[in-house]
Regions:
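Short secondary-structure junction motifs
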Residues: 18, 78-81, 241, 372, ...
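Carbohydrate-associated surface elements
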Residues: 112
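N-terminal glycine/serine-rich phosphate-binding loop of ATP-dependent small-molecule kinases
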Residues: 1-106, 117, 245, 261-269, ...
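Glycine-rich phosphate/pyrophosphate-binding loops
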Residues: 242-244, 488
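Gly/charged, well-structured mid-domain segments that form the phosphate/adenylate-handling core
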Residues: 245-252
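Flexible loop residues that form catalytic
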Residues: 89, 251, 444
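Active-site core segments that coordinate phosphate-bearing ligands/cofactors
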Residues: 2-12, 23, 120-134, 141-142, ...
Length: 540
């Protein structure tokens, strides 16, 4: 290809609350630029308390409309697109009929709590205790990291495992069709790949696939063995024929069928949101760490070519897997991940409660006072994840006094988000033994200077924010461009990524803020196990 060749990559990003499509223009080995965008809201459905769903038909319509609108915004025709890259939220799934394409139920999202009692029952079950004891015994003799991971296994609501088990038990038509082997399961990426290649014929036969980064976080995929975990499928009665073929991120995903957008478009990459943001922040080296602060916060540590076990609540994942070159060299990368499910959701709640009129105001409000006047906030709408691990924790302010102003409460709220992420950072240090030199942040909440500076002070290392904070779409585009030969090496991606701001730790504030964090941890202790207290339960 000539250096002047122009390429246009459409990147579809299906998140928890929004669907976005970006059109990027670039020349071979050149710097990309976003020339067209389109957005749509994901319409979440709440059919029962704790249930969170997405209507597949509405999602499908929105996906096609968003791609069309973004292409129009870029003043391009569909046949000018070089390829399509896809990034999706993880662990939201549906099941559909192989012969008719008809879904059996809405997408059950990763935030859904319908299987909460199953999760609690299994985590307290004799069976799981036996499995953990057996894994611990085997680890003692083999020193295998796989068995070490098994010795501390804990089921979680965001994983697919028990929500899928719930569906298999409670959907009559699905249970009936399971007998004939015509039921297919898939997360959003798998379902979209199926529909996009199928075209307008819902019964058209296509390969049932899912990329490895979307499979690895489901709870029944083994990142050590790179396969569906047979023990989990057996334990939770999940038939393997339901499941998609697991493929690399450089797989030949085929084309968008011409009946959908008027022309065939090459699908050059499919990748999960967190792995895509890893690429968007260019965390390609062992020891690199990035924190995505969106609806929730996700800390990912690049552990290189080794899959590490966790004993403090983080979990190992496959970050990406590529095959390239004539000799099919495999480039596989592992992550250690920790999550806090409430970050952007806390900001949105504060906005709705009238603490500020625009989230952009919150940083200046927090900095307008020297401290929080002793007020602390615990951000636990969805409980508290690692290293605290308490699904029944409550949220709330503590330490409010007659002198407390709105600015103090906003500062306490923002500080709590930084404290929560700093805990994940400390946990990652213990798990990996790495020495981090910087943290790359992305996601909407990373635009908040107060949170970024507080995080730098607490961790004692530089926090780096890229010029593009929506790095999920950028990362999927990078991966597609590499797969298509627009770029030849990951180093070229590092070279074209731009840094918008670096937050260096203020050592004069570090001691004070670490002390505040210790006080915040005492407040967290007050809110632990809140929703299992009998007098609290009786308030409902």
């Amino acid at each position: 290809m000539e250096a002047t060749d122009r390429h246009y990559i459409a990147t579809l990003d299906v998140g928890t609350t929004t669907i976005r499509c970006f059109i990027y223009a670039t020349s071979t080995n050149g710097e990309p630029a976003s020339i067209g965008t389109a957005y749509d809201q994901v319409q979440l459905i709440y059919p029962a308390p704790g249930w969170v769903e997405i209507n597949p038909d509405k999602l499908w319509t929105s996906v096609l409309q968003t791609i069309r609108k973004a292409t129009e915004d870029a003043n391009l025709s569909m046949d000018q697109l070089t390829c399509l890259a896809i990034s999706t939220q993880r662990n939201s799934f549906t099941c559909w009929n192989r012969n008719t394409g008809q879904v059996y139920h809405n997408f059950i999202t990763w935030k859904d709590l319908r299987a909460d009692q199953l999760v609690k029952d299994w985590n307290n079950s004799l069976m799981l205790r036996v499995i953990k004891l057996g894994a611990s015994f085997l680890h003692f003799f083999t020193r295998s990291k796989r068995f070490l991971a098994g010795s501390v296994i804990k089921l979680m609501n965001p994983q697919v495992t028990l929500r899928l088990s719930w569906v298999l038990q409670n959907n009559p038509s699905l249970k009936e069709d399971l007998k004939t082997g015509n039921v297919l399961y898939g997360t959003i990426d798998s379902w979209l790949l199926y529909r996009l290649r199928q075209g307008t014929d819902p019964a058209g036969p296509v390969e049932h696939i899912s990329d490895v980064t979307n499979c690895t976080s489901t709870g029944f995929y083994d990142p050590f063995g790179e396969e569906w975990a047979g023990w989990a499928l057996s334990l939770f009665s999940i038939k393997k024929e339901l499941l998609p073929k697991v493929v690399d991120n450089s797989y030949d995903f085929g084309h968008v069928h011409e009946t959908l957008l008027g022309t065939k478009i090459k699908i050059a990459a499919s990748v999960s949101d967190q792995s895509a943001s890893l690429w968007g922040t260019c965390c390609f080296e062992r020891g690199d760490v990035k924190i995505t602060m969106g609806t929730g916060s996700f800390l990912n540590v690049n552990t290189g070519t080794k899959c590490l076990a966790s004993v403090h609540g983080l979990y190992p994942l496959i970050g990406y897997k590529l095959q390239s070159g004539k000799d099919s060299m495999v480039d596989i990368n592992y992550l250690m991940e920790g999550a806090s499910n409430d970050t952007g959701s806390i900001i949105e709640w504060a906005l709705n409660m009238g603490f500020f009129e625009d989230p952009a105001e919150s940083a200046s409000m927090a900095m307008s006072v020297p401290n929080s006047d002793g007020v602390l906030f615990v951000p636990a709408f969805s409980g508290l994840g690692p290293p605290i691990q308490d699904d029944s924790a409550g949220s709330g302010f503590i330490g409010i006094k007659p002198s407390t102003r709105k600015e103090h409460m906003v500062r306490a709220l923002l500080e709590s988000l930084a404290f929560r992420v700093a805990l994940l950072h400390d946990c990652a240090l213990k798990e990996t033994g790495f020495s981090f030199t910087s943290i790359k942040v992305d996601g909407g909440v990373s635009k908040n200077d107060f949170i970024c500076q507080t995080l730098a002070n607490l961790t004692g290392i530089v926090v780096e924010r890229g010029e593009v904070t929506d790095s999920t779409a950028m990362g999927a585009m990078f991966m597609a461009g590499l797969n298509c030969g627009i770029w030849n090496t990951k180093q070229q991606l590092v070279d074209v990524r731009k840094v918008e701001k670096k937050f260096s730790p203020d050592m004069t504030q570090r001691t004070k803020q670490l002390k505040q964090m210790r006080g915040w941890e005492r407040a967290v202790d007050r809110f632990k196990k809140w929703y299992i207290l009998e007098d609290i339960k009786n308030l409902d």
